[in-house]
């Protein structure tokens, strides 16, 4: 899981609008995306 977070932050650091988000904001966004993905994969 740690490697996943490293890839996530490396990828998002290159996106200008995500670069300005703090680490907690990016974690919150990631959690929301993962929940959304879980809901979509169940249906």
UniProtKB/Swiss-Prot annotation:
Keywords: Phosphotransferase system, Sugar transport, Transport. Pfam families: SgrT. The keyword Transport applies. Signal peptide: none annotated. One of its GO terms (biological process) is negative regulation of D-glucose import. Transmembrane segments: none annotated. GO terms for molecular function: enzyme inhibitor activity. It comes from the Bacteria. The keyword Transport applies. InterPro entries: SgrT. Induction: By (toxic) non-metabolizable glucose phosphate analogs under the control of SgrR (at protein level). Entirely encoded within the transcript for the small RNA sgrS. Acts to promote recovery from glucose-phosphate stress due to intracellular accumulation of glucose-6-phosphate caused by disruption of glycolytic flux or in the presence of (toxic) non-metabolizable glucose phosphate analogs. It may do so by inhibiting the transporter activity for glucose uptake (PtsG) as cells that overexpress this protein do not seem to import glucose although they have nearly wild-type levels of PtsG. This is Putative inhibitor of glucose uptake transporter SgrT. The gene is sgrT.
